[in-house]
Amino acid sequence: FPGLNLALAAACDALGVRLIAVSSVTASTWGANQPGFTWPEMEAMLVEGGVIRPASVAVAAGGAADAAADLAGEDRALASRIRDAAAVRLGVPALRPGSFEEAVGLRLRAYRRAAAGAPVALYVNVGGAEASMGHSPAILGVGTGFVTGRALRGTRGVTAWFAEQGVPILMLLNVRELALRWGVGL
């Protein structure tokens, strides 16, 4: 989903909106899944090159428990090294949770700290990060696009927490569905 991340950053910049993000190293088969080209590494290159403004306020390994716990030992260690290096390049904390619940809490603290008391106008979830979406089977029925808090009940991730606070939610996950809905050619 690096294209969605970049499009979101560009849209926020064009609108004069401050983007606050927590970026994950691990990704699915939809891009940003090669060492050297994970999203946090791409973001660092784009920021260093003056292409986009910094958005990430923290970097996580991603995957299970936001700690790449679903990866084999060597791959988990690589994800951790990439997380740490990208966090240094971006000048933000590296999140090191010990559980799913801690991962959600660390992300929420990062968002609240960066917002500095200002209200969050919209929460945009790009991709399928477990800490953001939760790990309940209910998440599979949430859909894509603007979703209601009712659809998120029982998911327990960061997205559900923001929905419970009355923050509008935009899910950018099923790109094909979004393109068909809005008449965008594939």
Stretches with model-predicted labels:
Residues F1-T38:
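Membrane-embedded segments
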Residues P2-L6, V25-T29, A64-A65, G127-S132, ...:
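Gly/Ser/Thr-rich loops at beta-strand to alpha-helix junctions
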Residues N5, A9, V104, L108, ...:
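Short amphipathic alpha-helical segments and helix-helix/interface helices
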Residues S23, A60, V124-V126, L172-L173:
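Short beta-strand segments
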Residues F37-V51, G141-G149:
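Acidic, Ser/Thr-rich peripheral helices and adjacent loops at domain boundaries
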Residues E41-P119:
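A substrate-binding/cap region within the structured catalytic cores of diverse enzymes
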Residues S99-L108, G127, G149-G154:
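A general structural motif
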Residues P119-L122, A129-L186:
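C-terminal functional extensions of proteins
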